[in-house]
């Protein structure tokens, strides 16, 4: 059964490593050393819930509801455009160090709310967990499926805690105005690129519904 565990671990790592809103938020909280381990835990637990829902039956609901899939896709496009705009606006600010200090004043609950938004409003999370992992895991018997799910969940926990701790360790270098400008510019452009790719998928979904 360990082979199924490592299959899930490798696939989960491959899907979670690319830069997205969730990774960007965890990284930024690590750089600020503000509730970064709590955020890593909440992201990992959210992934656990989504992965289990997708692998153990949730994928069928999404795949059988094309309008729901289209709604999730276009909602994600709007969210990613907004998130990317915020990152680029910060990158073009006149005083990034002042902006970073201002963000440090955010309360715990506001940070948690933002984390929930970047996780649960991100359509890629549902496409990855429900469509990709769900379709692969759904083909397995019950016991192998459990090991496969455990592997993908392990990848999430290892990645989010590793990212948060690494960002906190590198904080003195990454907290400078120059580094923050580069990071926010990269995050903003990547978010807009993902939004563009999702918009193309959304148009395809709508065309399929109308035909």
From Swiss-Prot:
It is found in: Cell inner membrane. Involved in the export of arginine. Important to control the intracellular level of arginine and the correct balance between arginine and lysine. Belongs to the LysE/ArgO transporter (TC 2.A.75) family. It comes from the Bacteria. One of its GO terms (molecular function) is L-arginine transmembrane transporter activity. It catalyses: L-arginine(in) = L-arginine(out). This is Arginine exporter protein ArgO. It is a multi-pass membrane protein. NCBIfam families: 2a75, PRK09304.1. It comes from Enterobacter sp. (strain 638). HAMAP family: ArgO (MF_01901). GO terms for cellular component: plasma membrane. The gene is argO. Keywords: Amino-acid transport, Cell inner membrane, Cell membrane, Membrane, Transmembrane, Transmembrane helix, Transport. Its main location: membrane. The keyword Transmembrane helix applies. The keyword Transmembrane helix applies. The chain crosses the membrane at residues 1-21, 37-57, 68-88, 111-131, 147-167, 186-206. InterPro entries: Arg_export_ArgO_enterobac, LeuE-type, Lys/arg_exporter. PANTHER family: ARGININE EXPORTER PROTEIN ARGO, ARGININE EXPORTER PROTEIN ARGO-RELATED.
């Amino acid at each position: 059964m360990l082979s199924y565990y490592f299959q899930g671990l490798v696939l989960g790592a491959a899907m979670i490593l690319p830069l997205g809103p969730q990774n960007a938020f965890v990284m930024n909280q690590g750089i600020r050393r503000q509730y970064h381990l709590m955020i890593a835990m909440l992201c990992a637990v959210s992934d656990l819930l989504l992965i289990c829902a997708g692998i153990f039956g949730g994928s069928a609901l999404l795949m059988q509801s094309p309008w729901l899939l289209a709604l999730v896709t276009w909602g994600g496009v709007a969210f990613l455009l907004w998130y990317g705009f915020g990152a680029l606006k910060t990158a073009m600010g006149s005083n990034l160090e002042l902006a970073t200090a201002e963000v440090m004043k955010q309360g715990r609950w506001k940070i948690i709310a933002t984390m929930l938004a970047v996780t649960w409003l991100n359509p890629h999370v549902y496409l990855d967990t429900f469509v990709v992992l769900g379709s692969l895991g759904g083909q397995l018997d019950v016991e192998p499926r459990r090991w496969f799910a455990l592997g993908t969940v392990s990848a999430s926990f290892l990645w989010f805690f590793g990212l948060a701790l690494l960002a906190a360790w590198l904080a003195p270098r990454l907290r400078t105005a120059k580094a923050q400008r580069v990071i926010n510019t990269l995050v903003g452009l990547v978010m807009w690129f993902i939004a563009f790719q999702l918009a193309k998928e959304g148009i395809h979904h709508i065309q399929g519904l109308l035909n």
